[in-house]
């Protein structure tokens, strides 16, 4: 099952979500962020990010990337795609969603999400580790969080690894 925003890309298919396709390209890059690898690639002069969903916690040690199928509306990548689209329409600073894929197999599924890359961005965690966080950065983070809070948008897993600074 694939859903996508057809305003930028008209021809997304299964192959578009395959990491190996993009890794054959010299300009592709792999970053190990969070629970798994993230693929950065270029297509039609646009820069994208491909994220495959991996489980965390104790269960993730035994079942790396499979989730219980509860229907399309309950799938992680579809939910995130729809939420990002909604937040973009609200004018909030989030990555623009391009496509989401769910591969169902029996009672489980795997999931992938593609967004537009926020170029020249680093996670807040990376900036802290590099000792590049000053008063202006903290103020910008605070203003951004306040903006989300004012619109009653609350991230269920907000941490320094998923706050991007550009």
List each model region and its residues.
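Conserved catalytic-core element of eukaryotic-like protein kinases
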Residues: 154
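AlphaC helix of the protein kinase catalytic domain
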Residues: 123-132
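Alpha-helix N-cap and loop-to-helix initiation/capping positions
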Residues: 72, 132-136
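Hydrophobic residue at the +6 position relative to the catalytic HRD Asp in the kinase catalytic loop
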Residues: 158-165
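Conserved alphaE helix
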Residues: 136-144
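Conserved ATP-binding subdomain of kinase catalytic cores across diverse folds
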Residues: 15-122, 146, 150-151
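N-terminal presequences and immediately downstream first alpha-helices
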Residues: 1-17, 41
């Amino acid at each position: 099952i694939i859903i996508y925003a057809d305003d930028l890309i008209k021809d997304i298919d299964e192959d578009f979500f395959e990491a190996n396709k993009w890794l054959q390209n010299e300009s592709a890059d792999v970053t190990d962020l969070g629970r798994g690898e993230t693929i950065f690639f270029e297509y039609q002069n646009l820069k994208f990010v491909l994220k495959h969903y991996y489980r965390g916690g104790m269960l993730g040690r035994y079942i790396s990337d499979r989730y219980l199928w509860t229907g399309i509306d309950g799938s992680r990548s579809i939910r995130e795609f729809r939420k990002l689209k909604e937040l973009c329409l609200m004018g909030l600073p989030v990555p623009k969603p391009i496509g989401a894929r769910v591969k169902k197999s029996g009672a489980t599924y795997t999931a992938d999400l593609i967004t537009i890359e926020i170029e020249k961005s680093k996670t807040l965690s990376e900036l802290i580790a590099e000792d590049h966080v000053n008063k202006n950065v903290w103020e910008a983070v605070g203003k951004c969080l306040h903006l989300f809070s004012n619109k009653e948008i609350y991230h269920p897993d907000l941490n320094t690894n998923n706050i991007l600074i550009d």
